[in-house]
Amino acid sequence: MTLILGIDPGSRITGFGVVRQTARGCEYVASGCIRTGGGELHERLQIVFRGVSEIIRQHGPVTMGIERVFMARNADSALKLGQARGAAIVAAAEAGLEIAEYSASQVKQAVAGTGGANKEQVMMMVMHLLKLTQKPQIDASDALAIALCHAHTRSSLIPHGLATARRRGGRLRL
């Protein structure tokens, strides 16, 4: 049994999802959103860092999947998103978690079967795979999808890939 944390980073809303990977598949543990409000950027990044640190403390995951930054039309938004990712990655690294990064299309492919799936399709598959009866918040759904993608990818990489990544500093880029 392995606890996996998925993070959908954002400078205003960061989604999180925790799943338990067992021999029979994945089970839902927890999900939600870290809301940073409208303060200064450094204050919002601190909230993301502390929020992710608290989730790790509460649930005890051993590995984390996080979405990669995509280059948006607005460079300022992409920069802020990258900084929020950094805050979450540092929180996970401080706790000793293995960290893997996934593109949005990789997550969609792993969960919905196509890299072009929309958010609603991804959410429906997350609900089906984790046997959820209520729709999670959209950012939490995305984070659960990232956790499921990471669980699927870990299953195909173990033992070689993650052991190699651990020797190289704990960061696995897929």
UniProtKB/Swiss-Prot annotation:
It holds the Pfam family RuvC. The active site is at D8, E67, D139. InterPro entries: RNaseH-like_sf (IPR012337), RNaseH_sf (IPR036397), X-over_junc_endoDNase_Mg_BS (IPR020563), X-over_junc_endoDNase_RuvC (IPR002176). The RuvA-RuvB-RuvC complex processes Holliday junction (HJ) DNA during genetic recombination and DNA repair. Endonuclease that resolves HJ intermediates. Cleaves cruciform DNA by making single-stranded nicks across the HJ at symmetrical positions within the homologous arms, yielding a 5'-phosphate and a 3'-hydroxyl group; requires a central core of homology in the junction. The consensus cleavage sequence is 5'-(A/T)TT(C/G)-3'. Cleavage occurs on the 3'-side of the TT dinucleotide at the point of strand exchange. PROSITE patterns: RUVC. Belongs to the RuvC family. The gene is ruvC. Mg(2+) 2 binds at E67. Its cofactor is Mg(2+). SUPFAM superfamilies: Ribonuclease H-like (SSF53098). One of its GO terms (molecular function) is DNA binding. GO terms for biological process: DNA recombination; DNA repair. Binds 2 Mg(2+) ion per subunit. PANTHER family: CROSSOVER JUNCTION ENDODEOXYRIBONUCLEASE RUVC (PTHR30194:SF3). Homodimer which binds Holliday junction (HJ) DNA. The HJ becomes 2-fold symmetrical on binding to RuvC with unstacked arms; it has a different conformation from HJ DNA in complex with RuvA. In the full resolvosome a probable DNA-RuvA(4)-RuvB(12)-RuvC(2) complex forms which resolves the HJ. Gene3D superfamilies: Ribonuclease H-like superfamily/Ribonuclease H (3.30.420.10). The keyword Metal-binding applies. Its EC number is 3.1.21.10. Mg(2+) 1 binds at D8, D139. It catalyses: Endonucleolytic cleavage at a junction such as a reciprocal single-stranded crossover between two homologous DNA duplexes (Holliday junction). Keywords: Cytoplasm, DNA damage, DNA recombination, DNA repair, DNA-binding, Endonuclease, Hydrolase, Magnesium, Metal-binding, Nuclease. This is Crossover junction endodeoxyribonuclease RuvC. It is found in: Cytoplasm. The lineage of its organism: Bacteria, Pseudomonadati, Pseudomonadota, Gammaproteobacteria, Pseudomonadales. The keyword DNA-binding applies. It is an enzyme of class 3 (hydrolase). It comes from Pseudomonas entomophila (strain L48).
